[in-house]
Amino acid sequence: MKRTVIMMLDSFGVGAAGDAAKFGDLGSDTFGHIAKACAEGEADIGREGPLTLPNLARLGLAHAAMESTGAFAPGFADNVELIGAYGHAQELSSGKDTPSGHWEMAGVPVLFEWGYFSEHQNSFPKELTDKILARAGLDGFLGNCHASGTTILEELGEEHMRSGKPIFYTSADSVFQIACHEGTFGLENLYRLCEIAREELEPYNIGRVIARPFDGTGPSDFARTGNRKDYSLEPPAKTVLDKLKAAGGEVVSVGKIADIYAYCGITKKVKANGLEALFDATLAEVKSAGENTIVFTNFVDFDSHYGHRRDVAGYAKGLEYFDSRLPEMLALLDEDDLLILTADHGCDPTWQGTDHTREYVPVLAYGAGLKAGSLGRRNSFADIGQSIASYFKLEPMEYGESFI
């Protein structure tokens, strides 16, 4: 039986990419810097000691990072019995954003430039916001700036609740984000507002509109809820997900995968929030998956909870939890199944600012007759999509080189 499981550790980079300097990210290293902080006792909040990832190490994580950076991360060495094939991949796409990374790993790199709102204050054109407000029947908005999603709630959450004005903000990514309180503004009202924004942003070539609902009574307890929704553009070409679906296969989205691909190539969507629930849902879908199925999960917490918030200890604790559950996944796989663990970009929690980092991503593959050992440096994330196409005997993708 042929089934593929893709476990996408959102933001888990393994060292500055070859073109990192262009992005101001030379020296970034999500995995390496987390390991270093743990080894030096600087990540002992909610956990303690060196970073411990025995199962990821057996799949080749430390070796992939060593090939990327030239040295083993602190606390890791060439002393494990490898069971997986490992490599590190350079992004071909022009950006270091979520859609670019996901689309490219499915065989469709983003070779055009996204639109961005580069001004840190007064970020959005008045013509754009006027149109959004008019269509939504609103008399104003808050924000209009680059911001951390948690900080802006502390600063503007109460005013939003008093005034009913939505919070518009952006970042270094190609995004337009809208934060609203679920209780006072309403979740469906937020979703409708995001749909309007998605339509009005068409001329600006913005990759995503993101609904950022939150709850709480004040700055001390404002918190994002699990009802985030991404409104992405459609990929510019057919991905390997589309091709498997067209061939009669199944593509199961766990978490935000369906949103990122604008539902293209998806046959089933499973909602789950948090590392535990996402892992539980992934296991459940693999247990019930039949022939010619992809189960594709985005573990977003690594990015949204730990990377952007520059929470090194939280990131380490999350990785150790993820690692502790990998034996459950390995036990479910048949001999012919293919497991791939990878990432879509970096988000080094020790780096300046709060944005993504341009890094190599790990490519860890297990099963399907693959021999344990190095896959080397991959020139594109699209090698993953090409390998999946080869595995399912689909028409080859335009980009990427199969490692199967």
UniProtKB/Swiss-Prot annotation:
Similarity section: Belongs to the phosphopentomutase family.
Name used for this protein in its record: Phosphopentomutase
Organism: Shewanella sp. (strain ANA-3)
GO BP, sorted A to Z: 2-deoxyribose 1-phosphate catabolic process; 5-phosphoribose 1-diphosphate biosynthetic process; metabolic compound salvage; nucleotide metabolic process
Entry keyword annotation includes Cytoplasm: yes
HAMAP family: Phosphopentomut (MF_00740)
Positions contributing to Mn(2+) 2 binding: D303, H308, H356
NCBIfam families tied to this protein: deoB (TIGR01696), PRK05362.1 (NF003766)
Keyword annotations from UniProtKB, A to Z: Cytoplasm, Isomerase, Manganese, Metal-binding
Binding site residues for Mn(2+) 1: D10, D344, H345
Cofactor: Mn(2+)
